[in-house]
Amino acid sequence: MGLRPAVLLLCASVSLLGGLTFGYELAVISGALLPLQLNFGLSCLEQELLVGSLLLGALLASLVGGFLIDCYGRRRAILGSNAVLLAGSLILGLASSLPWLLLGRLSVGFAISLSSMACCIYVSELVGPRQRGVLVSLYEVGITVGILFSYGLNYVLAGSPWGWRHMFGWAAAPALLQSLSLFLLPAGAEGTAAPKDLIPLQGRETSKPGLVKPQYSFLDLFRAQDGMWSRTVVGLGLVLFQQLTGQPNVLYYASTIFRSVGFHGGSSAVLASVGLGTVKVAATLVATGLVDRAGRRVLLLFGCALMALSVSGIGLVSFAVSLDSGPSCLATSNASQQVDLPGSSGLLVRSSLPPVLHTNGDQGQLVLSVTERPIHPVITASLGPVLNTASPVPTSPILEHTLLCWSALVCMMVYVSAFSVGFGPVTWLVLSEIYPAEIRGRAFAFCSSFNWAANLFISLSFLDLIGAIGLAWTFLLYGLTAVLGLAFIYLLVPETKGQSLAEIEQQFQTSRFPLNFGHRQRIGIQYHRLDVSSAS
């Protein structure tokens, strides 16, 4: 027991460093894309392929990663993903042509997606119920810290001739440190040595030796046996509502709102984005501290309700403020991306430019549209939807206009914080708890693939949705979706706070319909307490 604090610290480092690598790789392309375009003369389509190749690799990993995690174990999957990431970073750092860049990005995307699934499962199985929420949520904290770290590094290396090579190479550092931590930890809950290894950490939560474990196939996820269908409904519902509430798109308009309230110029916009990222890190830290105290359901309900109010507020402000949007994509652009992955954070990813360059727009997104336009030598547009706020504002309503813009900024800050408290960290924590160990990797990967697919769908449909119903109604639609998500969480998502994985397993096996989860949870805890008191 004397080694327990050290082991818990190693578990925390695995979760935090895994998230840091994930967040850094998501954000690094925002600072590297412009120098890559200048060095390789990338066209608009080539830039979109370069940005989207990471998403493609991540989607591939979500399709096959579950089988790798269940067959070879969680720790081996993480170590293997780190090896792929190191290879991808090396390819990117030494790349001399677009195909090598695409191969490197594809490899990195595969690695971070596989690692994100394996890390959450590995840590959730390795520690007891009292530490599980905090340690798994540290992965989300790592993502936000990694993105902030990429902001600073991109800003420092923006003027360096080969700065983009160093940007890609720095991702190897947290991956190497995580691998070192893994070598000092047990293999995990699977394998013959697992009960002996986990005794110091989980105590009575470990499986009894000699107990015959059930075998599950992938199709069992859709059957009623052992409550598997209920688990699948809960898992898919959480990942889909995480995306359908508009998280991949809301922050595409962040830089325009920043400019509207006075953040003019490249450096000011970068600092404003860092401020937004700092708010997100703070909210994630709050969620990490509360997840084992307040519970998973409470954070999900609170976060989703706050998201519904804040995104609806952005929509209402959009009715009052004249905002125009239009897709544009030039070969020379200040491109940035915002991608929300497992355990994803939804943080604005913003690139910093050398002082001599000027941009009319600061935000971009993954593949949205390609317009056939001639390449202009001056950077005048950005990837993705851009809000035109350059129209003159009459002198008389200037105060009202300023208040509305600040209201939109506050709503966006609240939205980011609400996501970081609820869907951001808790979704992947719940997914790592509700499935049996024998199929946990495949189930987690199955839900993760829907998360990536929904992210891509929301991103690709954003411009068409705005063209059909307008910007304000688009945000109000996201608010309505958040209300539906609130009802889903209240009715179907169980509370897993303070329960061992075995107790969560029993809860699903004995409940035929998820609507009974809240009542059954209270009864289960009551009997557990009576049993403990009588035993003492």
Curated annotation (Swiss-Prot):
Enumerate the UniProt keywords alphabetically: Cytoplasm, Membrane, Sugar transport, Transmembrane, Transmembrane helix, Transport
Decide whether keyword Transmembrane is in the record: yes
In which residues is D-glucose bound? Q242, Q243, W428
List the catalysed reactions. D-glucose(out) = D-glucose(in)
Q: What does this gene product do?
A: Facilitative glucose transporter required for the development of the cardiovascular system.
Q: What is this protein called?
A: Solute carrier family 2, facilitated glucose transporter member 10
Outline which residue ranges sit on the Extracellular face: 37-48, 104-107, 154-166, 254-269, 320-402, 464-468
Q: Is Membrane included in the keywords of this UniProt record?
A: yes
Major place of residence: membrane
One GO BP on record is: embryonic skeletal joint development
Give one Pfam family. Answer: Sugar_tr
What subcellular compartments does it reside in? Endomembrane system; Cytoplasm, Perinuclear region
Q: Which GO terms describe its cellular component?
A: cytosol; endomembrane system; perinuclear region of cytoplasm; plasma membrane
Q: Which family does it belong to?
A: Belongs to the major facilitator superfamily. Sugar transporter (TC 2.A.1.1) family. Glucose transporter subfamily.
